[in-house]
């Protein structure tokens, strides 16, 4: 049968001792770790690279329509002005956050 949330199954297997280690996408790993029955340590893989996909760290991005520089400026200013609040929301969901150099944010 097809799994709807394999990351949740992986996290449960980790908590239940069926796995010693798991590699998951950071936002999903953090979210599941926050809900887990036992503490789980999240370690961002910031320096590792894979053969097929390269680096494992990348930024979230937003896209806008071309030729709308004022809208782009508005969005960029909203993000910049609200970055701490955005970070707090993401932290609330357990999302591991990194600075521009790939170092974990406190």
Question: PLM features: residue spans?
Answer:
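Proline/Glycine/Serine-rich low-complexity intrinsically disordered segments
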Residues: 1-106
